[in-house]
Regions:
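Extracytoplasmic ligand-binding site segments that recognize negatively charged/polar headgroups
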Residues: 6-13, 22-159
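A ligand-binding cleft/hinge motif common to bilobed small-molecule-binding domains
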Residues: 33-37, 155, 159-180, 229
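Short beta-strand->loop
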Residues: 45-53, 65-69, 92, 161, ...
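Periplasmic-binding protein-like
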Residues: 56-57, 73, 133-136, 143-144, ...
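A bilobed periplasmic-binding-protein/Venus flytrap-type ligand-binding module shared by bacterial periplasmic
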Residues: 76-83, 121, 193-208, 224-227
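Short, catalytically relevant binding-site loops at active-site mouths
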Residues: 150, 167-171, 188-190
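Mature extracytoplasmic/periplasmic domains
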Residues: 200-249
Length: 249
């Protein structure tokens, strides 16, 4: 049985509130911005999948004996290249130069929204608050989730730029043959997003849960990640759909 909620942050909060009374065996869909909170919650058991770093290929070393990564990507500001001829090429340009209308997601309820907080902090450190004040003048809406921001604001034309992922253009290419959507690759770098899964300590089905985590690293599971979750698989990136091959990152 699968139970879905509208965001990773909501999912983790739900599990924390349920505590030892939760009926969940596995939680999946968390990302790096929630890693520390999940790790400190003391709700997750060590997995029995073996040495993860021998089984996966990530841009960074994976350092956890509780959580299994299953896909990754990078946060980015996405725009229509037919409408926006001079997109921002850095966070500095986005904040200080662009006149474009921007839509982002609420960090309290959205993974990309929380990722942007971390991204800004990584770039600006203690000065992030001042940069946020300047960026806020360009933001026309802060939505609860990604779908509302992307489709109801960006794709409708109400916003020029939306917070999303570097892989978002691949979806438009694969499913619409639309090459008009691009992602800005920033000079400061684009912050990585790794999604992962973990087993709850209270699970009464730990063997089955561990078998499922192993399945998540199998070719059968990983091969459909690019076309379903529009992210990079963690085990083999050599057989990506053509739409992914021209992405900068």
């Amino acid at each position: 049985k699968f139970v879905a909620v509208d965001s990773a942050a909501t999912l983790l909060n739900k599990i924390i509130l349920e505590g030892s009374s939760t009926k969940a065996d596995i939680i999946l869909g968390l990302d790096m911005s929630l890693f520390d909170v999940a790790n400190r919650s003391n709700l997750f058991a060590k997995h029995k999948v073996g040495n993860i770093n021998k089984q996966i290929r990530l841009p960074i070393k994976w350092d956890s004996d509780k959580f299994i990564p299953y896909n990754y990507g990078y946060f980015a500001f996405v725009y229509n290249n037919k409408n926006l001829k001079k997109p921002p090429l850095s966070m500095n340009e986005l904040i200080n130069s662009t006149k474009a209308r921007i839509v982002i997601q609420d960090p309290r309820t959205s993974t990309p929204g929380l990722g942007l907080l971390t991204w800004m902090k990584a770039i600006y450190g203690d000065n992030a608050g001042n940069e946020w004040k300047k960026l806020n003048k360009k933001i026309i809406s802060v939505t609860k989730g990604w779908t509302d921001a992307y489709y109801n604001f960006f794709m409708s034309g109400e916003a020029d730029i939306v917070l999303s992922y570097t892989t978002s253009p691949a979806a438009h290419i694969m499913f619409e043959n639309n090459f008009d959507i691009s992602a800005s690759i920033f000079d400061e770098g684009n912050y990585i997003s790794i999604e992962f899964a973990g087993i709850l300590k209270t699970s009464k089905n730990k063997k089955i849960a561990n078998d499922f985590l192993k399945f998540m690293l199998s070719d059968d599971f990983q091969s459909v990640i690019p076309s379903t979750n529009i992210m990079y698989p963690v085990t083999n990136i050599n057989n990506l759909p053509d739409a992914f091959k021209n992405l900068e990152i």
